[in-house]
Amino acid sequence: MNDEDKVHDISKKIEREKALINAAQAMRQQTNNEQVRSKLDTQMREGRRNLEFFEEKLRELQMRRLGHGVDNMSLGASPMSGSHRQSVDDFEGYGAPSPPPKEDVRGHSSHQSQGSGPLMPASAPYPGGPPDSNVPRARPNYTRLDLIKFDTPHLGPRIQLMLSQIQFKLNVEEQYLKGIEKMVQLYQMEGDKKSKLDAAAKRVESKQKIVLLKQALKRYEELHIDIDVDGPDDDSINLPALRKPLSGTLSIRILAVKDVDHAPLGRFARSPETFIAVKAEDIVVARTKPSRNDKWEAEFHTFPVDKTNEIEFTVYDKPAEHPVPIAMLWVRISDIVEELRRKKIEAEMTSAGWVSADRVGSRAPPPQFPMGAQSPQFAAPPTSPGSQEQNTMIPPQAPPPSQVVSQPVDGWFNLEPYGQIHLSFNFIKGARPQGMDRLGRKGAVRQRKEEVHEMYGHKFVQKQFYNIMRCALCGDFLKYSAGMQCEDCKYTCHTKCYTSVVTKCISKSNAETDPDEEKINHRIPHRFIPFSNLTANWCCHCGYMLPIGSKKNSRKCSECALTAHAQCVHLVPDFCGMSMAVANQILEGMRTQKKTHKDKASSMSERTLRPGSKTSISSGSIAQASTYSGSTAYTSIASPEATEAAKLMYSQTTPRPGGPDRTSTSSTTASAAAAAAMAPKHSSQPSQAGSIPDFGGSPGYGRPDSRDDEYSAQQQQGYGSPQQRKYNPADYANIDAYSSPQARPQQQQQQQQQTPQQVSPMYQQNPQTPISKPQPVAPSYDNQVVPSASGVPVPTKKPLPSATDPGTGMRIGLDHFNFLAVLGKGNFGKVMLAETKKSRKLYAIKVLKKEFIIENDEVESIRSEKRVFLIANRERHPFLTNLHACFQTETRVYFVMEYISGGDLMLHIQRGMFGTKRAQFYAAEVCLALKYFHENGVIYRDLKLDNILLTLDGHIKIADYGLCKEDMWYGSTTSTFCGTPEFMAPEILLDKKYGRAVDWWAFGVLIYQMLLQQSPFRGEDEDEIYDAILADEPLYPIHMPRDSVSILQKLLTREPDQRLGSGPTDAQEIMSQPFFRNINWDDIYHKRVQPPFLPQIKSATDTSNFDSEFTSVTPVLTPVQSVLSQAMQEEFRGFSYTADFE
């Protein structure tokens, strides 16, 4: 449908609504029945609202047509037309303020930082995108609960939501009716009259519900307008927090219903009795008393819910013996919890006088709060710790946030198909943690590694889904249950179905495909076209429901009617016209036939070949035959004994980690390789179980996301095969950023010309040889980047250190130290203060139990942490904690680190506010530390006040490298769910691929906390914090300096590609911001700036700057009862290390 047809369609709907309104007005004048008049008034009110909606959409469509006309008249899209389209495409409800573009610093060019030089440009030197690409799309300022309220102004999003919801409810109810009809027939056959009558009553109710759902669906389909808009894709994203069933206590008050279509009665009958039933997961948990006036006085219901998703309200009339449903409403408990959280935060911030970023700096205070002229620039809420000295911002008449009582959710909600209901909700979560809504210590979370099941390259892991999913193989629903999902391509199916998957994972290249594996020569591609999804459809690949209404993300095959997301269509196999079940039957038949032929061939060879024929073929002929890739004629000539011996030797000569294999270990391929005798040590076949791993930096033992790792990629390809490198800007320093595609084959050709014996340096390193370390000379900022031909400075890639680097080789053990105090505790161990017995020098020793490391599959994570320490040691970075030694005992491993006696910033901010200058100083040093990490291909992923230590000279040092990820250059991505909840970027929560920009989001949260002594995204548990990160707009004191608000807006941008620091210049985008205009970065790096605060200690062993919760514990190593096997101990080979400095 083109724009002309859409305009015509909307015009017809406008005329129809006007005719209905006029008819209702005429009917109202001709009747005196108050009940009829009330119903006509409701119809006219809804008609006027629909009329406004249609007229608004007509204006949007006309403006879009006008914008397209302007584009066609010009040579290219002008900035005016781009911004014009932005205003047109913004869907109804997108009214939240947008952060400014991250490159918008030209207005502050006169305030450039001193000493920045050419490395801190006023704007990013790389080309920008389209004219309107720098401004992120505004976020919707409504919740799902707002959409089901009767008087919601967001009619467009409500139509999309209800189309999806009602269509799904209708599908479920129709399946339910089929089951009831079978029950009626069964009871009739058995002669059970009572059960038959009960089932018949349920059948009548189910049929009536289907009638109501069809009426509601038809109503919303008539209101829907097919206009391409980028609406929020809600249910098609598996959010780990928002879709989780909740447990707790739900309180409901039912007050009234009105404008419902009551059941028809006789002329002289009284008004029917009406009651409301409340269901939780299809179980009736509450029922109101009957009412004849549609009102209830004291209907309070409180009941516990256990892992419940949704509450259903059904309004019944009882005109005769059996009640008849007349209206329905569905409310998700997570929506109630989100509304309660937002109301509480809004009440606290309003009482404190905080506003959104667009109102900061305005002269008039918010209307709810009269601010006096004596108030300071900004201060923390009075309940935050350390704010007693600066509590003048909130006047006495404003209630402090701690006294703000959370009010229940109250309002009129829309019933389907007609009517409204007045409800009041409250919900108290069960087992809620304490202190999550305040600034304090919070542990990091990390997604645990799951058992991986491989099938045709898919890496299936079992997952629990909290929304309705459809199996991509058999097409049935998963329905709130566990299923299998590929970690790489997100293919989703039943647990019982994953073994029948016949399609190859997109992450598996053709080179990795087994040449003997069965393939279907059915190559009929689908013809996917965009379509407006008006009903409940599911993606045939990932199993999630398609977004309703928008053509942008919905595709449908014009031949076989298969539906998929736009981003999933390239993953759908070319089986148009063939179901997956049929494809699986064909492949099973091919496998059976091949096995039969193979068995026959082997039996024939055993009967006909003479013993002497084994040696009749010369080695030269075998070598000649092996040069033909398609020839497999000689693979069956060797005897079974020789083949088994060759396979055994073949598997032993390629030591590989014991992790999940990427390719199948079919005996056919191994036999072929054994007979061909083609350099087994360079082969890429996986090892057999139980092989001893190589400890030259090989991963796969506990890395949360080893599939992105450079080392696992080397293992997958084999040591001798050409290694496919990840993108690194340093590799392209002398190449134009926009080089022609013709240059790429030459680069690939050069990579293929590498010698087969080329091995990564980490595998050639001799662990017995001491490695010379670079001198700890502070690098100059003039030499840290290499400018490319395109003008984009890119960091030079330095070689990664080996996890088995022994350093100087000097042996250090547990008997060298005395433990003095406990400084902190973590997931697998603790950090203790220790002194050497000889020199009495103090060190912080991180102690981890081997048993826990192996149980949680974290061996590779420990190796990675050591490698990151060596990266920090490489240049003795002034703001990174350095490693002095590593050693191990039979039960534990130990990291010997420098002792920072000033405590962490969390302790100091709890003692008092930092102020702007102090926060700016710490932020500058943290920025340089992150810059160094990113220049060495490391993302930190756990930036928080707890991990930033303060030295006695007042400077900071970042500690705890347990969540760092290596080999993360510009453009590299990973997908592990990890971090501390308050600091996790939205892309992590949305289970998307992410890169270095997650560190800059956490950097924004850190600056916010240092300036305002509280988190920008708060909640009483992790789920509420995740909700806030995805939905809330950070608030600021009304007189907060504009430079501070600006950098926070740009860092806390939810779109990672628009976030400050996400470009190839990385930290330089942050360093050039007006917030740091007075910072001399060279002086900061060389510690020439006087720190604003110096921590105090009474003696060298004084631990008063650490939490007494830890320091009060006796510093002893608890005995470990378990004994590790020799194979487990081998996992830690090469861990010991000694630095060449003290």
From Swiss-Prot:
Feature: compositional bias, Polar residues: 385-394, 613-622
Reactions catalysed, as given in the entry: L-seryl-[protein] + ATP = O-phospho-L-seryl-[protein] + ADP + H(+); L-threonyl-[protein] + ATP = O-phospho-L-threonyl-[protein] + ADP + H(+)
E.C. designation(s): 2.7.11.13
Residue ranges constituting the REM-1 domain according to the UniProt record: 1-67, 149-226
PROSITE patterns (UniProt xref): AGC_KINASE_CTER, C2, PROTEIN_KINASE_ATP, PROTEIN_KINASE_DOM, PROTEIN_KINASE_ST, REM_1, ZF_DAG_PE_1, ZF_DAG_PE_2
InterPro entries in alphabetical order: AGC-kinase_C, C1-like_sf, C2_dom, C2_domain_sf, C2_fungal_PKC, HR1_rho-bd, HR1_rpt_sf, Kinase-like_dom_sf
Domain C2: 231-349
Name this polypeptide is given: Protein kinase C-like
